[in-house]
From Swiss-Prot:
Protein name: ADP,ATP carrier protein 1
Disulfide cross-links: 37-85
UniProt entry tagged with the keyword Membrane: yes
Subcellular location: Cell membrane
Any one GO cellular component localisation term in the record: plasma membrane
Similarity section: Belongs to the ADP/ATP translocase tlc family.
Alphabetized NCBIfam families for the sequence: AAA
SUPFAM superfamilies per UniProt: MFS general substrate transporter
Organism: Rickettsia bellii (strain RML369-C)
Gene giving rise to this polypeptide: tlcA
Length: 498
C-alpha cells in the first residue's frame, strides 16, 4: 500500500516538475532546443547591438533607429513575409528567412565588422556635416556608422520575425490544445535559461584575459556562435518536418484545419474601437503607458551606462550580465506570478507594475538629479559613486519591468478581456494589439527623437529633466487607467456572476 502511495506521489511530482509525457519528448525537446537557440541569438544580439550603437554613435541614436529605421523595416519585412507565404510552402518560408539572417551574420562577421574604415564614410566628413546641419546630426551620424545601424536593425528584426512570428506560428501549428497547456510554460522556463548562458558566453569571450582572436576582433567568436546557432535552428526545423510531422501520434494535420484566425483590424478601425469603448481604451492606455515609460527610462539609463562603461567590450559585457539578471527574474516571476494573481484582487495585481515603475523611476532620477549631494553623503559609506549607483538602480528598474511584464502585467491585461462579450473581446483585443503595440513600442522613441531634432544642442544628460517629467505624467495616467478599468471590470464581473 505504501509503495503504491509512494509511486503515486513520485508520479504527481514528476508531472509538476516535468509535465511532458515520455512519448512527447520527441516533439517537445527539439522545439525547446529551437527556442533556446533563437533566444540565445536574441539575447546576444540585444547585448551587442546596444554596445555598438551607444559607444560608437551615441545613446540618443537609438530612438532615431527605432523610429525611422526599425519601424519601417519591420513593416517591409511583414510585407515580404506575406508575399513569400503566397508563393512558397510554409516550410520553405522558414528556410528563406532564417537563411537570410544567417547570410547577414556571416557578412557582418567576416566583412563589415573587421573593416570599419573601409565600409564607413570619412569620420571628419560626417562630423563637419553634423556641425553644418545640427537638427539632422543624429541621422548623419547613423549614416556615418551605417553597418552598426544595420546590425541594430537586424537584431530587432530577429526577435520580431524568428521568435514572435516563425517559431510561435510553427508551435501553434503543430501543438494540440492539451499539449499547449503543458508545453508552453515549459518553453518559457527552459528558453529563459538562454539569457544567463548568453551572459557567460559574452563574459568569457570579451574578457580582457581571453585572447582567442586579435584585440580589434574580440566580437568575432560571438558572431560565429550566432551563425552556428542559426544553422542549428534550420537543421532542427528540418528534422522535425521529417520525423515529427510525419508521426501521426505527434501531429495530426486535420487539427490545423478549422482553427479560426484572429480578428485583424486596420489602424482606423482600431482607433474607432478604442475611442468608442471606454473599457477597451483603458486597456490600450495600459499598453501604451508601459511601452513609453520603459523606453524613457531605458534611454537615459543607457546613456549613463556608456559613461560608466565607455568601451564596446565593457558595455556589452554589462549588457550580457543584464540579460542574465533578466532571465533569472523572469523565471522567478513566472513561478510566483500565478500565486500572486490567485491571492490578491485584480486591482492589486494590476497596480504592482505601475507602482514598481514609479518607485524605481523616482530612485533612478533622484540619483541623476542629486548626484553631487548623494556623493557627499555616501562618500566613505559605499565604494560605488553616484554614477554607478544610478546605473545599478536603472538596471534593477529595467530588470523588474521586464520580469513583471511577462507575469503580472500581461496576465492582468488578458484577464480584463474575459468579462467582455465575444464580439467586443475579439475585436477589442485586436484593436489594442494594433494601437497599443505600435504606439507603446515606438512612443518613447518618437518623443525622444523629436525632442533631439527640435533641440539639437541637447543630449540625454541635458534632456533628462524633460524626459523624467514626461515619465511621471505617463505613469500617473497609467495608475488612473488601472483604477478606471478596475471599476468597469468589477461591474462586468458582477453582472456575469448574477
Amino acid at each position: 500500500m505504501s509503495t503504491t502511495k509512494s509511486d503515486n506521489y513520485i508520479s504527481e511530482l514528476r508531472k509538476v516538475i516535468w509535465p511532458i509525457e515520455r512519448y512527447e519528448n520527441k516533439k517537445f525537446l527539439p522545439m525547446a532546443f529551437m527556442m533556446f537557440c533563437i533566444l540565445l541569438n536574441y539575447s546576444t544580439l540585444r547585448s551587442i547591438k546596444d554596445g555598438f550603437v551607444v559607444t560608437d554613435i551615441g545613446a540618443e541614436a537609438i530612438s532615431f533607429l527605432k523610429t525611422y529605421i526599425v519601424l519601417p523595416s519591420a513593416v517591409i519585412a511583414m510585407i515580404v513575409y506575406v508575399k513569400l507565404c503566397d508563393i512558397l510552402k510554409q516550410e520553405n518560408v522558414f528556410y528563406v528567412i532564417t537563411s537570410f539572417f544567417l547570410a547577414y551574420f556571416a557578412l557582418f562577421a567576416f566583412v563589415l565588422y573587421p573593416n570599419p574604415d573601409l565600409v564607413h564614410p570619412n569620420p571628419e566628413a560626417i562630423e563637419s556635416l553634423s556641425l553644418a546641419y545640427p537638427n539632422f546630426k543624429w541621422f548623419i551620424r547613423i549614416v556615418g556608422k551605417w553597418s552598426f545601424a544595420s546590425f541594430y536593425t537586424m537584431a530587432e528584426l530577429w526577435g520580431t520575425l524568428m521568435l514572435s512570428l516563425l517559431f510561435w506560428q510553427f508551435a501553434n501549428q503543430i501543438t494540440k490544445t492539451d499539449e499547449a497547456k503543458r508545453f508552453y510554460s515549459m518553453f518559457g522556463l527552459l528558453a529563459n535559461l538562454a539569457l544567463p548562458v548568453t551572459s557567460l558566453i559574452i563574459g568569457y569571450f570579451l574578457h580582457e584575459k581571453t585572447q582567442i582572436v586579435a584585440e580589434h576582433l574580440k566580437f568575432t567568436p560571438l558572431f560565429v556562435i550566432m551563425i552556428i546557432s542559426s544553422l542549428a535552428v534550420i537543421l532542427t526545423y528540418r528534422w522535425m518536418n521529417k520525423n515529427v510531422l510525419t508521426d501521426p501520434k505527434l501531429y495530426d494535420p486535420a487539427l490545423v484545419k478549422g482553427k479560426k484566425a484572429k480578428a485583424k483590424m486596420s489602424l482606423i478601425e482600431s482607433f474607432k474601437m478604442i475611442f468608442t469603448s471606454k473599457y477597451v481604451g483603458y486597456i490600450a492606455l495600459l499598453l501604451i503607458a508601459y511601452g513609453i515609460s520603459v523606453n524613457l527610462v531605458e534611454g537615459v539609463w543607457k546613456s549613463k551606462l556608456k559613461e560608466l562603461h565607455p568601451t564596446k567590450e565593457a558595455y556589452t559585457m554589462y549588457m550580457g550580465q543584464f540579460q542574465a539578471y533578466q532571465g533569472w527574474v523572469a523565471i522567478a516571476f513566472m513561478i510566483i506570478g500565478s500565486n500572486i494573481l490567485r491571492k490578491v484582487s485584480w486591482l492589486t495585481a494590476a497596480m504592482i507594475t505601475p507602482l514598481m515603475m514609479l518607485i524605481t523611476g523616482i530612485a533612478f532620477f533622484a540619483f541623476i538629479f542629486f548626484d553631487s549631494v548623494i556623493a557627499m553623503y555616501l562618500t566613505g559609506i559605499l565604494a560605488s559613486g553616484p554614477l554607478a549607483l544610478a546605473v545599478m538602480i536603472g538596471t534593477i528598474q529595467n530588470v523588474l519591468s521586464k520580469g513583471v511584464k511577462y507575469s503580472l502585467f500581461d496576465a492582468t491585461k488578458n484577464m480584463a478581456y474575459i468579462p467582455l462579450d465575444k464580439d467586443l473581446r475579439v475585436k477589442g483585443q485586436a484593436a489594442v494589439e494594433v494601437i497599443g503595440g505600435r504606439f507603446g513600442k515606438s512612443g518613447g522613441a518618437i518623443i525622444q527623437s523629436t525632442f533631439f531634432i527640435i533641440f539639437p544642442a541637447l543630449g540625454f544628460v541635458e534632456a533628462t529633466p524633460y524626459f523624467a517629467s514626461i515619465f511621471f505624467v505617463i505613469v500617473i495616467l497609467w495608475i488612473y487607467a488601472v483604477k478606471g478599468l478596475n471599476k468597469e471590470y468589477q461591474v462586468l464581473v458582477n453582472n456575469t456572476e448574477k
